[in-house]
Structures are given as C-alpha cells and as structure tokens.
Amino acid sequence: MKQNNLNVKEKKFSKVAFSHVGCEKNLVDTQHMQGLLDKDGYEVESNINDANIVVVNTCSFIETAREESIRKILEYTNQGKEVIVAGCMAQHFKEELLKEIPEIKGLVGTGDYQKIAKVLDRVEKGEIVNEVSKIPEFIADEEIPRFVDKNKFVAYLRIAEGCNYNCAFCIIPKLRGPQRSRTIESIVSEAKSLAKQGIKEIILISQITTNYGKDIYGKPSLAKLLNELSKVPIPWIRIHYAYPTGLTDEVIRAFKDSKNIVPYFDLPLQHSHPDVLKSMNRPWQASLNESILEKIREEIPSAVLRTSLIVGFPGEKKEHFEHLLEFLDRHKFDHVGVFIFSPEEGTAAFDLPNKVSPEVAAARKDNVISVQQNISKDKNQSYVGSKMKILVEKISDNNELIGRSYNFAPEIDGNVILSISANNYLRNYIGKFVEANISFADEYDLYGETIKIL
C-alpha cells in the first residue's frame, strides 16, 4: 500500500501493517488509523512480512471473533513483531490482554484510534501503552485522514457511532459507547470526496442507521440525510442496519424519490416470535415486523430485503422456532444471515435460564439455512431472462467478469458472474457498470453474458 503524502512529518523508520478482524465499522477505524500513520510519516505496508509493527484491529462481538483476534495477536507476537491491539477486544479486555499476553506493546480503544500515531511514538520509546478511554466518545469526520482502497470501488461511510439501545444479547453499547452522529454537512462532504476518488458505491453504516441524528438534531434525521446525499454524484448509495422503528414514511419516500439510493433494506430483525423478542429486550419489534415488511413491498415493489437472525436464544422453544420458519416462508427475504446465540459476559442474556443446547441450536441454524436457500434460489431465478445493471469489480481465474447488481451487497450476498467475448480487454471493464443478460441462477449467484458498458 506504501502511500506517499506530501503533507507528512519527517519519515519514520518503523514500517507498520494492519490486521483487521470484524465488521465494516471496524474496517473504517482501520482505514482511519492507516491514514493517520501515513500522514505522520510512517510507512504503512500492505504486506505484514515487511513490517516490524503490526496493529491488530480486533472484534469482540462473539466468541469466534475473539478467538480469531487472539490467534492473530499470537501469530504476530510469535514472529517477533511489535503488536498493538486496537478495537473492541482492547476496549473489552484491556487488563486481561496485557496480563495474559505480555508481549503486547500497546492497546488502543474504540474511541481512541485517532491517537494511533502518538501510541506508536510511545511504543517506539519502549513504553507499554494503554490508551483506552472508559467511555468511547470520539467519532471521526471528513477531516481525519483515511485510506480507502479505490480498487474496490466501494466505500463504507459511517454516519454515527455507538448505540443507546440495550438489546439483551449485545455487548456493543459497552464497547462503542453511546450514539454520536456526524452532521449532515460532514457526511455529505465525505461522500463528495469519495465520489471524486472514483468510488461507485457508498454504504451508510452505524449501529442503527435509522436512529441517525437523534442525538444532535433531537429526532431521527435519516430521511433528510438521504435527500442531501441523493444530490452527490455516486451511482449507488446503500443503507445497512435499518431498524423497523425508524423506517418512517419519510425514509421510505426518500428511497422512492432518489435515483441513486438503491432499494435494498438491511433489517437485523433477529427473531419473529414476541416471546423471544421480549427476552431479547426488543418487545416493540414484534408488532412492527409484519407491517413494515408489507409496507416496503407495497411502496417499493423492486425492494430487496435482507435480515439477520439469532437461533438458540435462551428460552427459544420449538414453537418459537417454528414461528420463525413460518415467518421466513411468508415474507421470503432475498438474503438471510443466521447466527447461533453467543452468551456474552456483561450482557443481560448471559445469565438467562433455559439455555438451548448447542446441538439443538446448530440444527436450527442448519434448518434456517436450508429453508432460505430454497427461497433465495427462487428469488434469483426470477431474474433469469432479464437485463440487469452490474458493477464489475474483478476478473475470475476463468476470465469472467465478477460483479454485483444492486440486490447484492458486497461481502455478505452473492455475485454476478459474466462471460464476455475473448476479443475484449477485460481490465477495461473493472470499476464500470455494464448491462448484462442473466441466463442462469443458483441460490447464491447470478450468471449471464455482458452486453455493453453503460
């Protein structure tokens, strides 16, 4: 990645690389740290083997993410790298990490990544640094340097940080702090900058995007933000983490009225049964699930719906799970992510009785996946014979174009794989939109033939 910046301080001797674990919100933190170190004169490497310092930006949302984070920390300390641990694990387990892995040179909390250059300076002087605020309060704006990989043509745009909800299963409010939104002007400014860099799609993220602005404007202001962003020359704007309570008439109208806001609704509903939702401390949601899904389908027939679900939550009975399967069959989501409940110490759900056995939880997850695969396959096959607009992102080993239509979000959904005449120079298509004829579909991906560059 070796970036060159004319407005940097004196060149540092250390070479720094990053290892990233976790969600796209964590990825934005990593990109800001990369930008800050580059500005401060550090050589930021894409190859960890070439670096003497490794910043591991960790995730602590569920047990498997923590295990992956620890594996990476130990891998790099065993290689003799100077390791700095950033992110949610640093926030969650600062004392334990320094005690159990004394090779760690520094910790950087979720609200402290803007201090990364000073942390490295102190580490290089031999200090063991613990830079973790008790309550995270910082959120980066467009003035904080950020490295964005333009080769991917997609960028995440964080509109708020933290969360004021207290879902029983979720540790995030304790790790990320209370909600703090950026101003509309700040977000639009960054979106314009990304457009100038050639980004073709921005994805708005926060813990709850539909609560955006409530802390600074006195009420949720996502609709107003979308109306302003619709004026920015970005072909696709996608919204993740929308909650049913915030999908007001104004927000849905903004989706309908804006040409570049794609009708893709990412709704982390978690469950359908009122009893389970009450145990999850989301009692308000049960009465809204049905009505909001029906409203979206009615108002925007082309809408694509994605949700994430938790199975095996304490107290989830057979009838609760059957209710969930019926819910999936009735509403036929385009995409579903399903997770087995992970008991997190410090959450209300950690001590709940009536635990579901791991075997039953795993079987329920497999059942959801099986049901959804059939639904997704039917959904995808409905596109066969149609022409679609595709953003081409890379070339396969078989010299096919790989991209996405608006109904596929990056990383979590499927791809569109396109054949093309051998006489064409394939790299000319990377980062461009093409028109394609869809000729085949399976439960995950679409396949077709390229017609022309749009």
UniProtKB/Swiss-Prot annotation:
Transmembrane segments: none annotated. Residues 149-378 form the Radical SAM core domain. One of its GO terms (cellular component) is cytosol. It catalyses: L-aspartate(89)-[ribosomal protein uS12]-hydrogen + (sulfur carrier)-SH + AH2 + 2 S-adenosyl-L-methionine = 3-methylsulfanyl-L-aspartate(89)-[ribosomal protein uS12]-hydrogen + (sulfur carrier)-H + 5'-deoxyadenosine + L-methionine + A + S-adenosyl-L-homocysteine + 2 H(+). The gene is rimO. Belongs to the methylthiotransferase family. RimO subfamily. Catalyzes the methylthiolation of an aspartic acid residue of ribosomal protein uS12. [4Fe-4S] cluster 2 binds at residues 163, 167, 170. PROSITE patterns: MTTASE_N, MTTASE_RADICAL, RADICAL_SAM, TRAM. This is Ribosomal protein uS12 methylthiotransferase RimO. The keyword Transmembrane helix does not apply. It holds the Pfam family Radical_SAM. Its cofactor is [4Fe-4S] cluster. NCBIfam families: 30S ribosomal protein S12 methylthiotransferase RimO, MiaB/RimO family radical SAM methylthiotransferase. CDD domains: Radical_SAM. [4Fe-4S] cluster 1 binds at residues 23, 59, 88. Residues 14-125 form the MTTase N-terminal domain. Residues 381-452 form the TRAM domain. InterPro entries: Elp3/MiaA/NifB-like_rSAM, Methylthiotransferase, Methylthiotransferase_CS, Methylthiotransferase_N, Methylthiotransferase_N_sf, NA-bd_OB-fold, Ribosomal_uS12_MeSTrfase_RimO, rSAM. Binds 2 [4Fe-4S] clusters. One cluster is coordinated with 3 cysteines and an exchangeable S-adenosyl-L-methionine. The keyword Iron-sulfur applies. Coiled coil: none annotated. It comes from the Bacteria. Keywords: 4Fe-4S, Cytoplasm, Iron, Iron-sulfur, Metal-binding, S-adenosyl-L-methionine, Transferase. Gene3D superfamilies: Methylthiotransferase, N-terminal domain, Nucleic acid-binding proteins, tm_1862 like domain. One of its GO terms (molecular function) is metal ion binding.
